[in-house]
Amino acid sequence: MLIALSTSALQGAVNGFGSVMVTAYTTVGKLDQIVQQPYSSMATALGTYTGQNVGAGKDKRVWQGLRAAVLINFGFTLLMFVLVALFGEQMLGIFVRDQEVIHTALMGLRINSYFYGFLGLLYAVRGVLNGAGDAVYSAINGVIELVCRLAFAFVLIPKIGPMGCFLCGGITWVLASLVSVWRYAIGKWKTKAK
């Protein structure tokens, strides 16, 4: 939900590049939402799995589940990267027909596809943290993600133009996932459910 809010907040900056960019950005957002569905489902399943194992005192199984989820997400990420590389134009063509829009959107979709692995990692680790009862941190991390996305937009878009609209999301996914991994690694989540 926070990703959707920050994406909406960026719309004002995107609007400054004209209707082609607005349509391209919106189209890439639709495909990103489709890509996020397996990650989101994995996070939900991982949250339940984590809650059960933390409750049973089996913290080692939490790591095993997280590792398995990250590997599955990585496999899906590779699949999406290949699909975007080979069929990105056709994927975008599901939503729009204008070739100028497709060309611009393809640039954004390819940029985003480089960062999908971090998005999958972010969802998986947040799933564990939520399942372990560290939901407040996950909410705070989501707010930080929103703020970072907007900050990067205000820095990148004026400097590099339309590509900055797409890069700010990916860079934010990297930072948010690394902070979440750090939170997991320090083990504070182990004390939340007890």
Spans of model-derived segments:
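Hydrophobic alpha-helical transmembrane segments of multi-pass membrane proteins
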Residues: 1, 34-38, 114
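Short helix-kink/termination motifs in transmembrane helices of multi-pass secondary transporters
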Residues: 1-13, 17, 86, 90, ...
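Small-residue-rich hydrophobic transmembrane alpha-helices
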Residues: 7, 11, 24-88, 119-141
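Interfacial/gating helices of multi-pass transporter permease domains
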Residues: 14-33, 100-106, 134, 167
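Short runs within selected transmembrane alpha-helices of multi-pass transporters and secretion channels
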Residues: 40-43, 112-131, 137-149, 165-181
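Short alpha-helical transmembrane segments in multi-pass integral membrane proteins
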Residues: 50-115, 156-194
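Hydrophobic alpha-helical transmembrane segments in multi-pass integral membrane proteins
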Residues: 149-157
